Amino acid sequence: MTPSSRNFTAPSGHTIHYLQSGTSSGSLLVCLHGLGGSSETFLPVLQALPTSSNIVLVDFPGFGKSALNKASKPLTVVGTVLDIHSLISSIRDGAGTSNSEKIIFIGHSFGAIIALHYAAKHPDAVAGLALLGAGRAAGHIPAVRQRMLELASNVRNVGIDFAANAAAQSNFYADTLERSASPSARESVRKAVAASDPEGYAQTCEALVDLCHTDPDYSNIEAPTVFVAGDKDIISPADRSNELSKLMGGESWVVTVKSGHQQALEDPEGVGEALIQLLARVKDSP
């Protein structure tokens, strides 16, 4: 599958770039990346996705090829959910598909948070969720809030390389004789973050710990959901996926893969198996 490149101007004023693959008339499968990532985050697992689906890999504003409109209001979680909803409506209109057709979301980190908010707000619109390194609202935790606000400040004042170099460490784990992270994987993450718009990165950091950002009502989400946790993820430990799984309103389970915070990059086979599990559950759902 060779994805095609497209753009959409959201109501927020941001231009959202996305890659489209599979069958345009098929059911939507939307992939949402994490902080410092892009649509390319999901390329290692693209072959595990059904070509009969309309596969959409999104670049959030300020990441990948999506431009940040600096004249727009600062990025927020709620605003990003609205932009994704508008994008989905536009794609459906262009394909001539029904709004009643349910969506599968694959989200990584920040993208998993957006997918959870979307599913809680539009539970009848979602067929299933695959959430890699999922997180929760953390603005009420002083240490986390301070760390993210300091990261945003350093990116603005020192430059995006500050975040890029930090991510190449924090997204992985300490190397040992028994196991070490691939240098090429670290460099891939460093390059992805370094290519981000500094202001977009900073605003996303602030959005994640904004006091207005609270957890959605997870019990509203009844679609089958698989949480994919890295066994050495220090940003979003496996315990977080386990606790989130217990809060969901429908069938939910956790798959642990061999990775840090970059599940699709480090263990594409393990993530692919989790996606196949989800697709089977979705197919069997009423």
Locate the predicted segments by residue.
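Catalytic histidine-centered segment of alpha/beta-hydrolase-like enzymes
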Residues: S259-G272
